[in-house]
């Protein structure tokens, strides 16, 4: 039995050997010293090779159209190096975020993606890996990034069939100790900030009140729908720009957060607290009550920013077409929920249109428009997520850890995330 265990763990790549060894010895503790001594006696060359070969962290260049972020910035690459990890960076990976190859001091610059995937044990990405990229990853590799399994089930199948270990960063549980790993929150903060700037840029008037020789200019009225991370950042930014800001969310608990930023909370009398920090779906009666109150505020607004989105599900329709047609001429709607179809009925994802003299813009991949800080925040999220799994340059995930277990998408040829498994079949 002992020799059988040795054969199994010894045949695995370095990155998976330690996880398998830990699994055996966890359930049969007495085997730990025996296996260790036998491996030392029977396979000294393999052990020496493992000591000389720390895991290799691969940072490829993002291939998605318009994606300017990079998964690891130079400062974070140095942090990984201090953990004993060898960092490989594809040439040009940081160009979109204004990080040159030379700025990745201590990292190895690899000329092509194919060469990087052939060497990397642990791959980190912003966008989900494409089918071609998955095909280039070596056996036993691990990949971490935003996987969007609901949008790309075929890619999840490939990860499963190739028996790759994958972590979906959007599945990191929303608990206190995982806040520093939460890529959804960090990137939503970027999107909320940028949304307020997009609105100000498209508005036909000033945001702040101005007193001029020609008289006083009234401040713009801004309504932000959805008081999650993106919505609160949009509120804060619009306030800094001098606008009169109102905020709305179906979760009553957000009132205090909205008001703490100096905005007025719109109370529709509807409260819909859900699980995981998200709102539950409204009943038809609640939707009608919500609409009656919101329509008045939308009609009075110069700018409306919508942020109501739930990962993996269509965005709720909050602003009807006829409501848009009753808005002020020249009013602006920035629909941050466009990735899921939009909160406004007339939103065309990725496009700016004018409907009944109202500007409606549904931007996509907004964090990529601020690549420097979006990349920095994302890289720190990855560092905080992966650091507990790395010990002396070796990959040792604790599968009993809630954060690690909940974030695992595929492992050992299985889809571990239940909703994705049901979707893929």
Per-segment meaning from a language model:
Residues 108-118, 128-129, 275-303, 308-321, ...:
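A structured beta-alpha segment of the ubiquitous adenosine-cofactor-binding alpha/beta core
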Residues 139-158, 165, 304-348, 352, ...:
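ADP-ribose/adenylate-binding Rossmann-like module
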Residues 62, 131-221:
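Glycine/serine-rich phosphate-binding loop and adjoining beta1-alpha1 elements at the start
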Residues 170-172, 176-213, 338, 344-425:
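Adenosine-phosphate binding glycine-rich loop
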Residues 61, 65-82, 86-89, 210-297:
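Glycine-rich phosphate/diphosphate-binding loop of Rossmann-like nucleotide-binding domains
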Residues 128, 190, 228-229:
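Residue-level detector of alpha-helix initiation sites
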């Amino acid at each position: 039995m002992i020799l059988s265990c040795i054969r199994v763990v010894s045949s695995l790549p370095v990155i998976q050997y330690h996880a398998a060894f830990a699994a055996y010895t966890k359930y049969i503790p007495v085997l730990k010293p025996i296996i260790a001594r036998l491996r030392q006696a029977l396979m000294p060359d393999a052990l020496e090779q493992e000591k000389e070969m720390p895991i290799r962290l691969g940072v490829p260049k993002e291939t998605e159209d318009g994606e300017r972020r990079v998964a690891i910035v130079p400062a974070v690459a140095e942090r990984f190096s201090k953990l004993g990890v060898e960092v490989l960076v594809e040439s040009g990976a940081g160009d979109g975020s204004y990080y040159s190859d030379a700025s990745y001091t201590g990292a190895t610059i690899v000329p092509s993606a194919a060469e990087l995937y052939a060497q990397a044990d642990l791959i980190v990405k912003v966008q989900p890996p494409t089918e071609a990229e998955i095909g280039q990853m070596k056996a036993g590799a691990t990949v971490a990034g935003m996987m969007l399994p609901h949008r790309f089930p075929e890619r999840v199948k490939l990860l499963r069939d190739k028996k790759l270990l994958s972590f979906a960063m959007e599945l990191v549980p929303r608990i206190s100790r995982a806040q520093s790993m939460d890529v959804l929150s960090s990137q939503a903060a970027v999107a909320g900030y940028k949304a307020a700037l997009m609105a100000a840029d498209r508005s036909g008037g000033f945001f702040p009140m101005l007193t001029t020789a020609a008289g006083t200019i009234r401040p713009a009225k801004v309504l932000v729908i959805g008081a999650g991370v993106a919505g609160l950042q949009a509120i804060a930014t619009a306030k800094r720009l001098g606008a009169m800001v109102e905020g709305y969310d179906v979760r009553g608990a957000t009132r205090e957060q909205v008001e703490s930023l100096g905005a007025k909370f719109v109370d529709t009398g509807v409260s819909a607290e859900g699980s995981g920090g998200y709102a539950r779906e409204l009943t038809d009666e609640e939707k009608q009550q919500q609409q009656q109150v919101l329509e008045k505020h939308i009609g009075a607004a110069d700018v409306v920013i919508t942020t109501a989105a739930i990962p993996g599900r269509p965005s709720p329709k909050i602003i009807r077409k006829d409501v848009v047609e009753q808005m002020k001429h020249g009013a602006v709607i920035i629909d941050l929920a466009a990735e899921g179809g939009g909160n406004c009925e007339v939103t065309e994802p990725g496009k700016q249109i004018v409907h009944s003299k109202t500007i409606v813009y549904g931007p996509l991949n907004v964090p990529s428009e601020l690549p420097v800080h979006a990349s920095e925040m994302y890289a720190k999220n990855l560092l905080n997520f992966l650091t507990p799994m790395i010990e002396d340059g070796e990959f040792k995930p604790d599968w009993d850890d809630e954060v690690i277990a909940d974030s695992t998408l595929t492992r050992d040829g299985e889809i571990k995330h239940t909703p994705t498994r049901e979707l893929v079949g």
